[in-house]
Curated annotation (Swiss-Prot):
It holds the Pfam family B_solenoid_ydck. The lineage of its organism: Bacteria, Pseudomonadati, Pseudomonadota, Gammaproteobacteria, Enterobacterales. Keywords: Acyltransferase, Repeat, Transferase. This is Uncharacterized acetyltransferase YdcK. GO terms for molecular function: acyltransferase activity; nucleotidyltransferase activity. It comes from Escherichia coli (strain K12). It is an enzyme of class 2 (transferase). Belongs to the transferase hexapeptide repeat family. Coiled coil: none annotated. InterPro entries: B_solenoid_ydck_rpt, GlmU-like, Trimer_LpxA-like_sf, YdcK-like. Its EC number is 2.3.1.-.
Amino acid sequence: MRKYRLSEEQRAFSYQEDGTKKNVLLRQIIAISDFNDVIAGTAGGWIDRETVLAQEGNCWIYDQNAIAFGGAVISGNTRITGTSVLWGEVYATDNVWIDNSEISQGAYISDSVTIHDSLVYGQCRIFGHALIDQHSMIVAAQGLTPDHQLLLQIYDRARVSASRIVHQAQIYGDAVVRYAFIEHRAEVFDFASIEGNEENNVWLCDCAKVYGHAQVKAGIEEDAIPTIHYSSQVAEYAIVEGNCVLKHHVLVGGNAVVRGGPILLDEHVVIQGESRITGAVIIENHVELTDHAVVEAFDGDTVHVRGPKVINGEERITRTPLAGLL
């Protein structure tokens, strides 16, 4: 059963693809039967051909300023609202809701995903009950890492707000990401929280992972930008906050708190237990901090700890050990 027809009137639309200006002719969809919340005679958005919007299901392009073309496919019960633009082999199906957003170049969106006021570009998979909003930018790109086939994915109940997720990053589980820049093959999952702000984003790159109930938070001071590099991980109930840089093979786990700054952790550093690091601290080269150990720098001082070394029990370091200077 057909639910809409295309208008006789045509409308030209210009767009850029790979730096080349292109044009497409669009025709407006007009409902010819009542279905869901759409009444016969209602005019909707504009498409370039009937294959864009399925005649089956309750899918509909509600706003007369919304457009879909260039191999886009909208099916199931998908709702397209606001001034959305879908083009370039995009698939939106099941119970997806796309509002005031641009989706292009191979994105596949399914299940009960909601996308508000955001951009999704490139071959990626967004599914489950994921939510993307607050002017987020999802820009997928393959071929920049050794894992050429990996697709950028956001799924389960993950929420991404006011963030840039690029390359082949993975956001899933019940993860919450706000004001962050996550790139390459970095992952955020489980109940992890990435919390930047309007002043400073959190930056995850390379193969960094944040998971468990871990929290990574930016501060509002200048340079209070947590940066997780390479294969470093923040896990369990750990908190990393402020001007902190985790570089090569760093693990912060347990109930540890790392609060900069600036703090630099590098080369096989493990922070776990109930341990705490605050102030201007550098820890590098096979150092383990565990139990209730504390490394704390006071105003104007920098504490530098070099390994190999284990700091545990109730040990407290507030100035650079002599061995740390070697």
